[in-house]
Amino acid sequence: MEVIILPDPGRIGSLAADAITALITRKPDAVLGLATGSSPLAVYDELVSRYEAGQISFRQARGFTLDEYVGLPADHPERYRNVIDTAFAARVDFAPGAVQGPDGLADDIPAACAAYEAAIRDAGGVDLQILGIGTDGHIAFNEPGSSLASRTRIKTLTRQTRVDNARFFGGDLDQVPTHCLTQGLGTIMEARHLILIAMGRSKAEAVHHLVEGAVSAMWPATVLQMHPHVTVLLDDAAAQRLQLVDYYRETYRAKPAWQGI
C-alpha cells in the first residue's frame, strides 16, 4: 500500500488522472472502476479537461460503477448511473453502453447481482478502480460487518451512511434509500490497481484504520491491506491521525519519477 499526501484536491485529482492516462495510453480498451461521491470529482474533472484538450480518449474503454441504490426511478438525479454520467461518463467519449452499473430496479435482485459479476468477468476484470471511503470505513456500500470475501449483493445501509448521504437528497434523510446493490469486497479486490481517495478531517479516523489498523470486517476498507497494488491519496486533514505520516511524506519525496503510482 502506497500512501501519498498532497496539499489540495487539484493535486490529488491530477495524480490519479496521470495513472488513468498512462493506463489508457498503453491499453486503450482498459476497464475502469468508477466511484461516485465527492472524493473522485477532482479526478473526473481533470480527465474531462485532458479529453477536451485531445490528450486522452475513452472510445475503446469500458467502465463499471461500484454500487446503486435500490428502488430509485431510472431518471432520478441521485441514481448512481446518472451521477456517473453527469460527473464524468457523458462528458467524454465512452461508446454507448460502455459504462454499466448494477440494476437497482431489477425484479430478481440475486440474478441481477450475478449478472453484474458476470459482466465484469466477461470484460476481463477491472484494470483500475477508483474508491472513496466512508467515515465508518466502508468502501462502495460494504458497511461495517461485511464479509471480506463478499460478492455483488443487496445491502441494508447503516443510518450513518444514510445521514452522510442525505446532503445529496436535500438534507432529507427520509428520501435516502435504505437498500443498495454493491460490489463486494471480494469483487473489488480482484481489480488490478486500486486508487483510494480521502479528503477532509471527517475521514481521518477511517484512514487511520485503513492504513495502520488491523484487518477487520468492522472497518471494511482494511481488507485493502491485502491487495498487491493500492494507492491511497490523501490531503493533510485526512492524514492527520496517521502515526507514520512523516515517513509517508519522505518516501513519496524520494520516489523516482519513472515509477508512477
UniProtKB/Swiss-Prot annotation:
Q: Name one GO biological process term.
A: N-acetylneuraminate catabolic process
Q: In which pathway does it act?
A: Amino-sugar metabolism; N-acetylneuraminate degradation; D-fructose 6-phosphate from N-acetylneuraminate: step 5/5
Gene Ontology MF: a single term: glucosamine-6-phosphate deaminase activity
Q: Identify the CDD domains for this entry.
A: GlcN6P_deaminase
Please list the residues that make up the active site: 67, 136, 138, 143
Q: Which UniProt keywords apply?
A: Carbohydrate metabolism, Hydrolase
Under the heading Gene3D superfamilies, the entry gives: 3.40.50.1360
Which EC number(s) does UniProt give?
Answer: 3.5.99.6
GO CC annotations on file: cytoplasm
The domain of life for this entry's organism is Bacteria
Which InterPro entries does the protein's record reference? Glc/Gal-6P_isomerase (IPR006148), Glucosamine6P_isomerase (IPR004547), Glucosamine6P_isomerase_CS (IPR018321), NagB/RpiA_transferase-like (IPR037171)
Q: Which reaction does it catalyse?
A: alpha-D-glucosamine 6-phosphate + H2O = beta-D-fructose 6-phosphate + NH4(+)
Enzyme category, top tier = hydrolase
What function does the entry list?
Catalyzes the reversible isomerization-deamination of glucosamine 6-phosphate (GlcN6P) to form fructose 6-phosphate (Fru6P) and ammonium ion.
Describe the family membership recorded for this protein in Swiss-Prot or TrEMBL: Belongs to the glucosamine/galactosamine-6-phosphate isomerase family. NagB subfamily.
Q: What is this protein called?
A: Glucosamine-6-phosphate deaminase
Annotated source species: Mycolicibacterium smegmatis (strain ATCC 700084 / mc(2)155)
